[in-house]
Amino acid sequence: MRFYIKTFGCQMNENDSEAMAGLLVKEGFTPASSPEEADVVIINTCAVRRKSEEKAYSELGQVLKLKKKKKIVVGVAGCVAEKEREKFLEKGADFVLGTRAVPRVTEAVKKALEGEKVALFEDHLDEYTHELPRIRTSRHHAWVTIIHGCDRFCTYCIVPYTRGRERSRPMADILEEVKKLAEQGYREVTFLGQNVDAYGKDLKDGSSLAKLLEEASKIEGIERIWFLTSYPTDFSDELIEVIAKNPKVAKSVHLPVQSGSNRILKLMNRRYTKEEYLALLEKIRSKVPEVAISSDIIVGFPTETEEDFMETVDLVEKAQFERLNLAIYSPREGTVAWKYYKDDVPYEEKVRRMQFLMNLQKRINRKLNERYRGKTVRIIVEAQAKNGLFYGRDIRNKIIAFEGEDWMIGRFADVKVEKITAGPLYGKVVWVEKTPSPVSSSE
């Protein structure tokens, strides 16, 4: 039998989908390239924003139409599944899988194939180990979830309610997974967590993200290590030192700020001020001068005034982010903001504010990217884009596109930058590593 998984949302969802695929293949199922070719269709959903949730419902609607034409089993997983639970069974799905029940996907599928309606929401994170099979989407880079859940409870965020409280994987188990990846030819890993900086605190055995990075960097074959996503008040001096001194740890930090207004930050329950955030950036840059810092900002949070917004503009100008992800505030049912704050900023004003910041960030990007003009940069070749060009990232997470060939994927290459934009850079390959490229994409 064949299965198809459609994934929405964050990298952790991608990693969960890789695990579900691995478990199904282990049980004899075969991946399909589209829902039309599949006997089992799983929609792995995201609830972080209203738009992402709407996309998942739209996909479900299309699959349920297909179900009327052919016999298929339909499952819903991810954060919307955790939030809406059995409601999906009422809508026509055959099984629903909670965020901590991913290791039980084959149980759900088998029961659904026998005609049962299945809802699994038990906590099975203890089965989320290095032994869990995965079908990975890259030949050289792997996602590795190191901590599940979040304890921060920002007032706008649904994640603590859908992903649960923080729980770290034992360091030894994570390192076993990384060793296994290195043996299979993987060269890059990204450690994932909703609040990745909190890794180890709940283990109470001295584990920390900084120590994990150090230990993982000792594994032969692993060339680069990334981590996502950081929370400002958990970003330790120890972590900064590791980024500064360890050549395998990426000089790239994603540090969401969400707003530049202290009043709004307090309403968001972000637990820091604009001044404290900027001071943290200064501390990181003083130790890691080459670091690239990116961030997230929400515009139009309840009661956000023009004055609040201009505080955010001021922060963006001072922070000089390499990348900035912008989102329009959308109320998430069940959150504190949804319950207590009126969504009172007009949508048109939210759009205007987002567009203003987008234009500002483009100017900043263009200016920062000028530093690359004429330089030769070492990247790991990732893939071929739709426009036919190949691309890769340097250790600062800068994307560089170039004319290449498929055999280059997964290898180091030196690219001389010839063209600058506000987004990717463009260049010419001057050297490519001659060692064999990794070919395995499954475990």
From Swiss-Prot:
SUPFAM superfamilies: Radical SAM enzymes. Residues 136-367 form the Radical SAM core domain. Keywords: 4Fe-4S, Cytoplasm, Iron, Iron-sulfur, Metal-binding, S-adenosyl-L-methionine, Transferase, tRNA processing. Pfam families: Radical_SAM, TRAM, UPF0004. Residues 1-114 form the MTTase N-terminal domain. Its EC number is 2.8.4.3. One of its GO terms (biological process) is tRNA methylthiolation. [4Fe-4S] cluster 1 binds at residues 10, 46, 79. Changing residue 10 to A: Loss of activity. This is tRNA-2-methylthio-N(6)-dimethylallyladenosine synthase.
